[in-house]
Amino acid sequence: MAAFNTQKVLSVHHWTDAYFTFTCTRDESLRFENGQFVMVGLMVDGKPLMRAYSVASANWEEHLEFFSIKVQDGPLTSRLQHLKAGDEVLVSKKPTGTLICGDLNPGKHLYLLSTGTGIAPFLSITKDPEVYEQFEKVILVHGVRYKQDLAYYERFTQELPEHEYLGEMVKEKLIYYPVVSREEYPHRGHITDLMMSGKMFEDIGLPPINPQDDRAMLCGSPAMLKDTSGVLNHFGLTVSPKMGQRGDYLIERAFVDQ
């Protein structure tokens, strides 16, 4: 029995020459928790070429959504970026991943800290009503180099606050904090520096991170994970050592930009 199903591409959206999003059909048997990832790929020379992708759609949605970087000579992304509606992709049957809210200790505020395509699992988590029931505030931080790289900006500034079911919770609880490192922007710099200087907390009107109230999830490059973990440790938070064991913050260790 194959470890994956064939799905049909429904839409493709190119944000920039570096980032694109695609949606595809979802097998009825696929069950996942918001924040998890699956293997996605194509048949190449008669063999499946697969890579790990966080599911960017919520587990209650009928389709699947994925957010990808374009790597011109990347074995898979060099091909995936040319997808069109109607094409076929392979999606694994077994989701996995460490960004599961149930592995966090109870707290008041949930920080979702991401760079680049690392925002993908948080696109799913910010559509999860249970997350808003669990926390008083959910702070989504997305760090990119240039303003044009802020994919999904409109989702958080316009679409989600007006969402038929989630809108009221989003307006009350979700704080979107986009960060740009290489050009002028209200929140300019690197996430870690904005946390250490206290500017981020001043901007959003919350006290600096503390282990009593604050929980976090991290997704980004290996360097970002290392640096941001160091900052959270400095604030007194402890990482969940592995799936199924609770901690103050969680790291997705499965990804490097590919």
Give the ranges of each region predicted by the language model:
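Histidine-anchored nucleotide/phosphate-binding helix
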Residues: P121-E133
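Conserved S-adenosyl-L-methionine
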Residues: G107, V131-V138
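Reductase modules of NAD(P)H-dependent flavoproteins
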Residues: A2-A3, V141, Q148-Q258
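Ferredoxin-reductase
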Residues: A2-D87
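Ser/Thr-glycine-rich phosphate-binding loops at phosphate-binding pockets of nucleotides
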Residues: T115-P121
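Short, Lys/Arg- and Gly-enriched loop/turn segments at beta-strand edges
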Residues: G46-Y53, T96-L104
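Short, conserved phosphate/pyrophosphate- and ester-handling motifs at nucleotide-, phospho-/glycolipid
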Residues: G35, G118, S221
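Conserved beta-strand elements of the Class I
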Residues: L110-L113, M217
